[in-house]
Curated annotation (Swiss-Prot):
Belongs to the carbamate kinase family. Its EC number is 2.7.2.2. It comes from Pyrococcus abyssi (strain GE5 / Orsay). One of its GO terms (cellular component) is cytosol. Keywords: ATP-binding, Cytoplasm, Kinase, Nucleotide-binding, Transferase. The keyword Cell inner membrane does not apply. InterPro entries: AceGlu_kinase-like_sf (IPR036393), Asp/Glu/Uridylate_kinase (IPR001048), Carb_kinase (IPR003964), Shikimate_kinase_CS (IPR023000). Gene3D superfamilies: Acetylglutamate kinase-like. This is Carbamate kinase. It is an enzyme of class 2 (transferase). It is found in: Cytoplasm. Homodimer. Pfam families: AA_kinase.
Amino acid sequence: MPERVVIALGGNALQQRGQKGTYEEMMENVKKTAKQIAEIIARGYEVVITHGNGPQVGTILLHMDAGQSLHGIPAQPMDVAGAMSQGWIGYMIQQALRNELRKRGIEREVVTIVTQTIVDKDDPAFENPTKPVGPFYDEETAKKLAKEKGWVVKEDAGRGWRRVVPSPDPKRHVEAETIKKLVEDGVIVIASGGGGVPVIEEDGEIKGVEAVIDKDLAGERLAEEVNADILMILTDVNGAALYYGTEKETWLREVKVDEMERYYQEGHFKAGSMGPKVLAAIRFVKNGGKRAIIAHLEKAVEALEGKTGTQVIP
């Protein structure tokens, strides 16, 4: 049986540091990423793809902000912006990957699923919004918007004021069974983009909430739901490190999950960046996954072969 791998693409798969985020720039980056994924598929792995959406949701929110202030066009809520980003990014990845596979003589269906992720309406994150989203404002404008729209706003590292939203823990994907059926039918599925659209269950119905879900933690849930053997989180560094950015910096290669959990609890991994990646890797292996990998996007194939990156094992 071929091994099934969930590949979680970081922001650098779409937009490199210093780039403006034009369509042409993003498509060029996506084409490079598609080459890596196509090579993994050519080597016989079953692949499911998920991705981040931070800069793209930021762009959508800016577009809405400009449309509302300049033309009176009603802005849509945050969950809608998340769904829009899944369509935008998914379209680019599925097109580039299908083209790359065809170049190699591989005929496969590639499809994007707009995915909803259930979160607990009583998650403590809803009481403490921390995730900055959208444009920067001066203090006066930010506080005016907070009053008008019921937003929570905070000063963001001296750069201005921003809206902050909750980042609740993902529980499961509404479309999990559909995704699994497609994967088992040989379809390459792109799902849970940006962590999925956050929804809560209430009175037997689901409804969107204004929040952002960490895409690596949601990717871990996806990996469990499709019975993946491997979770591979691709980013812009070579893996996880102890004492990162200091003289004592030590890159981790192959680490048993209990040891990795100890490092996590000791606070070695920053909350907004490597922390969720390491937590996702720990959860996946503890919940029965064969291994989890954190590696550089450009070294995905080598990482899958165990030659680079951080490999978390049982």
